[in-house]
Amino acid sequence: MSKPRSGEVLQAAPGGQDAAAPTLSLSGKVALITGASSGIGRAIALAYAAAGADVALGYRSNRRGAEETAEQARAAGRRADPLQADIAESRDVDALADAVRRAFGRVDVWINNAGADILTGAAASLSWTEKLDRLLAVDLRGTVLASWKAVELMRAQPSGGVILNMSWDHVLAGGMKGEYAQVFCAAKGGVYSFSRALAHAAAPHIRVNVLGPGWIETAYGSALPESVKQRITKSIPLGRWGTPEDIAHAAVYLASDAARYVTGQMLAVNGGSVV
């Protein structure tokens, strides 16, 4: 194809696709979000409900939080069902998939957001070996198991689907100094590489992408000393921490028709802190 001249507008997309701007609507879709009791998972669930999707809300132990997310999603006029599962356990993943299929009939978007907390509460006192075990069990193994199950479900439905996995923007840059970065890069780097491989295997009817959050205002960020938070803020080109809603907006895009030609990619949502 020749390069368009100044002022020239291309009238058709390759392959005969309609060149009109695609929509960010998720109307009529069914989405499963794990780790939906709070934080990023809750923000994604509410953004999906606002975009027109019905949502299944996966949680491990915080049922109250999942119910609160469900109430807010229902206020947007959408169906929202909390479903308990520990994605580190293969039997729970199978049961979760069966529950979604029975309740909603299908799943169009499966978001593996659940992750192990190794930085706050009692988990903060664990050894780095114990923290690594937790991260690998939940963040990596759980994501792999759940993604395989999602592919199984989506291949059985004519519409295919979308899988979104949660990584970390710093895996693109080798992380930072210290054990913190090493254990997170081990788990989240695995999620990134696995997702790229799965995108090839699941194509052409299933898209697989990765979200790479940077410094986001979650429970961990709130627990940091103010001096540390300010130092981090100064290092971010856009001059602020991200919010769970920033991640949610990216998740809506990746699940929508606007991203219909995007697969096997990581979308880093980080204010430019890793480029």
Predicted segment positions?
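Amphipathic alpha-helical dimer-interface segment in Rossmann-like NAD(P)H-dependent oxidoreductases
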Residues: 98, 138-158, 171, 199-204, ...
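Conserved mid-core segment of classical short-chain dehydrogenase/reductases
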Residues: 94, 117-133, 175-183, 221-226
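Catalytic loop of short-chain dehydrogenase/reductase
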Residues: 116-117, 155, 164-190, 195-203, ...
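The beta1-alpha1 cofactor-binding region of Rossmann-like NAD(H)/NADP(H)-dependent oxidoreductases
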Residues: 63-64, 84-95, 129, 245-246
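Short, small/polar-rich loop/turn modules that mediate ligand/substrate recognition or access, typified
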Residues: 203-207, 262-264
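Catalytic Tyr-X3-Lys loop
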Residues: 127-145, 164, 184-191, 233, ...
